Each structure stands twice: as C-alpha cells, then as structure tokens.
C-alpha cells in the first residue's frame, strides 16, 4: 500500500541533501521523494513503512524526526520551482566523510576527584 512519510531532517548544505538523496535512492519501495533544504523537510512516497524510512534517513547522521502533525495540516504554499530531485554525484570517500560524527565528550571532574592542595601552616 502506497503511503507518504514526512520527516524533519537537519540539513545545512547540499552535501546533507546528497546524503539523504543517496540513502532514499537505494531504499526499496520508494516511488518518489522530495527534499526541501529550506524547510528541512523530506517527503517520501511509496510502498514503505514510516519507521523504515525514519531509520534509513537517520543512518546519514542527520538529526531526524517525524514532521509535526499540526504543521502538516496547515495549507501548503506553492512548491518552490527551484526544488528538484538531486542525483548523487559524490564519490564514496566524500560520502563517508559526511557520515562521520563528531564524537567530542564533555568531561567534567567530579567534586570528590577535584585536585586539592594541602594548606601550609
């Protein structure tokens, strides 16, 4: 059964759009999809399960959530004529670079482990 899945995806550049385009282009059951970087909105149509689409797009490393239902009920403005389906032209190495996640950990010393100096008398 064909259905439409709408996601909010954190995309800030054409590289982000390319990563989402790549994974959706390979996904089985997808008939069409639209990527709107301005609204950070991805609309997927086809014989797909919403959770499967969500998981597939999440694999790009982009922050992904379901599009809010109340926003979907609002009347839609005319589609931007400049929005088009983007074809993948990046090399595999460039794509892998985009998928890397910055893994900086915030490390704070615990109060009990804080360095103390003996008082001088």
UniProtKB/Swiss-Prot annotation:
Disulfide bonds: none annotated. GO terms for cellular component: chloroplast; cytosol. It comes from Arabidopsis thaliana (Mouse-ear cress). This is Copper transport protein CCH. One of its GO terms (biological process) is intracellular copper ion homeostasis. Its cofactor is Cu cation. Cu cation binds at residues 13, 16. PANTHER family: COPPER TRANSPORT PROTEIN ATOX1-RELATED, COPPER TRANSPORT PROTEIN CCH. Residues 73-121 have a biased composition (Basic and acidic residues). PROSITE patterns: HMA_2 (PS50846). Disruption phenotype: No visible phenotype under normal growth conditions. Expressed in phloem (at protein level).
């Amino acid at each position: 059964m064909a259905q439409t899945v709408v996601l909010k995806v954190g995309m800030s550049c054409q590289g982000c759009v390319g990563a989402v385009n790549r994974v959706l282009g390979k996904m089985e059951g997808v008939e069409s999809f639209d990527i709107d970087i301005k609204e950070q909105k991805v609309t997927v149509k086809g014989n797909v399960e919403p959770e499967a689409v969500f998981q597939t797009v999440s694999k790009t490393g982009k922050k992904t959530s379901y599009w809010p239902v109340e926003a979907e009920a609002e009347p839609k403005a005319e589609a931007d004529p400049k929005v088009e389906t983007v074809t993948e032209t990046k090399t595999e190495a460039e794509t892998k670079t985009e998928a890397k996640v910055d893994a900086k950990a915030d490390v704070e010393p615990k109060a009990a482990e804080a360095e103390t100096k003996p008082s001088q008398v």
